[in-house]
Amino acid sequence: MLPSQSPAIFTVSRLNQTVRLLLEHEMGQVWISGEISNFTQPASGHWYFTLKDDNAQVRCAMFRNSNRRVTFRPQHGQQVLVRANITLYEPRGDYQIIVESMQPAGEGLLQQKYEQLKAKLQAEGLFDQQLKKTLPSPAHCVGVITSKTGAALHDILHVLKRRDPSLPVIIYPTAVQGDDAPGQIVRAIELANLRNECDVLIVGRGGGSLEDLWSFNDERVARGIFASRIPVVSAVGHETDVTIADFVADLRAPTPSAAAEVVSRNQQELLRQVQSAQQRLEMAMDYYLANRTRRFTQIHHRLQQQHPQLRLARQQTTLERLQKRMSFALENQLKRAGQQQQRLTLRLNQQNPQPKIHRAQTRVQQLEYRLAENLRAQLSAMRERFGNTVTHLEAVSPLSTLARGYSVTSAADGAVLKQVKQVKVGETLTTRLGDGVVISEVSAVTKSRKPRKKN
């Protein structure tokens, strides 16, 4: 009989599955260094090979989606560094690794150091965006920390000369490759901060291999950039080259030329902006002057409409119209009277009594005389009223007042002067007389004294 607490019994499938899950979950992703052997690539495009060292070996698979990113062709006997996941092929119980990335062993070890330093500095907050310093805009002096014989310096100076020839540049020459390079780069950064001549620094070099660029992955350089009080722009290698210095710097430029573009002003663009602003200002001034001219024309037209001479002309027209109406009315009245006389004469002739005719003629003569007298009296009264109206209009006309020896003086803004306090010495005054205008300049202002009251 079996004991009461019998041990767990696994099927082969369950055992392999359990081991696979343990390997995948507990081990996770690892970096492995070894020598390639038995490398094959079937039609599927996947890679199958063995990684080995002097004492052991392990089977490896690298699927097509992953091996497409490898930049070299693996060779038998080549030392490589791979990043892989450990798993178990359950049908055969074979323990193997699934490779995600592969690098030659030398670069691979450097890449591993790079990732370790990157994680360390990131954990310390050296990459924090909130700690990045703002670049000056515009920069008044640029410091360049690079090799004095490298192509990077030539590219930077060429771009700065093209974009902003007047921008001062101070070069802090240093080695950018080799064992002494990190220390020299740090000392150059410290010197630039000590001399405090520049308000922005470009730290970088031209392109190269990972080993060539390794000085900018050095922890000392990273901490030197982070400690700089002057904003730092990193410009290391080409656009695809990313170093620790790029993460720590206040701004990363993909190339040295791009760094020069970032820290400099494009004077041609500034000139275009100034010219554009000038054009907009000229258009605004033209628009303003056009509006002022239109407003002046409107005001001038209104003043012309209100001119005393124009008002007198309108009154004269009205009087002439009334005179014509009056003359027409008198003519109509005389015409009607004549017609009435003719009718009466006709009636008298029809009756033909001589006495009545005589009396009627006498009566008619009297009526005619009275009518003529009345008409003459009315006409005389209307003419007298018309003459009085014309005389009154001429008396109240400003032109008549000016013709009698008076004048009207106004200030430069057109205001009519009534008191001496409206005038200041040096102002230009306009005096209108009966026959013209006098322009004068005030040389003195004297206010008349009020007479003292006698006790």
UniProtKB/Swiss-Prot annotation:
Any single Gene Ontology cellular-component annotation: exodeoxyribonuclease VII complex
Stored InterPro entries: Exonuc_VII_L, Exonuc_VII_lsu_C, OB-fold_nuc-bd_dom
Pfam family, one: Exonuc_VII_L
Signal peptide stretch: none
Coiled-coil stretches: none
Swiss-Prot/TrEMBL keywords: Cytoplasm, Exonuclease, Hydrolase, Nuclease
Record GO biological process: DNA catabolic process
A Gene Ontology molecular function term of the record: nucleic acid binding
Source organism, top-level taxon: Bacteria
Catalytic activity: Exonucleolytic cleavage in either 5'- to 3'- or 3'- to 5'-direction to yield nucleoside 5'-phosphates
EC number(s) stated in the UniProt entry for this protein: 3.1.11.6
Job of this protein: Bidirectionally degrades single-stranded DNA into large acid-insoluble oligonucleotides, which are then degraded further into small acid-soluble oligonucleotides.
Family in the record: Belongs to the XseA family.
Name recorded for this polypeptide: Exodeoxyribonuclease 7 large subunit
Lineage of the species this protein comes from: Bacteria, Pseudomonadati, Pseudomonadota, Gammaproteobacteria, Enterobacterales
